[in-house]
A protein has these predicted regions:
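Non-catalytic terminal and connector segments of soluble metabolic enzymes
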Residues: 1-135
Length: 135
């Protein structure tokens, strides 16, 4: 089994879409290995977005990501789990995401794009270590 990290962002939780997003992953055969609904603290966000901390947009991103609960998850599946999740999510910009993807079906804007998924196996392990240090 391969695993990846997925985060339903505050907009997904606020809009009542987290369950529908999880169902899409489960319907593709992915299994939830860990999940936690929580408000992300400053340290966790700084670690998760370490490459963005010094960028001009980071304060707005951090404010958005900490404004309400997120659903952090570890999903397990086949060797290409992270790629499967990324394909299901769609493009970063919901406006360019095809129908049938999470962002294409439910997304409204670039920043508030519902979901984050690790972009590689290495990123998945790093992000799992940040959000679920006991795994």
């Amino acid at each position: 089994m391969n695993r990846t990290f997925v985060l339903c962002k505050p907009d997904a939780v606020e809009r009542g879409l987290a369950g529908r997003i999880v169902t899409r992953f489960e319907d593709k055969g992915l299994k939830i290995a860990a999940a936690e609904l929580r408000v992300a603290d400053s340290d966790t966000l700084d670690q998760h977005y370490a490459e963005h901390v010094e960028k001009g947009f980071y304060p707005d991103l951090k404010a958005f990501m900490s404004r309400g609960p997120v659903l952090a998850m570890v999903l397990e599946g086949p060797e290409d789990t992270f790629a499967m999740v990324r394909s299901m999510m769609g493009e970063t910009n919901p406006a360019t995401s095809p129908p049938g993807t999470i962002r294409g079906d439910f997304g409204t804007e670039m920043t508030e794009n519902l979901v984050h998924g690790s972009d590689s196996n290495e990123s998945a392990e790093r992000e799992i270590g940040i959000w679920f240090p006991s795994l």
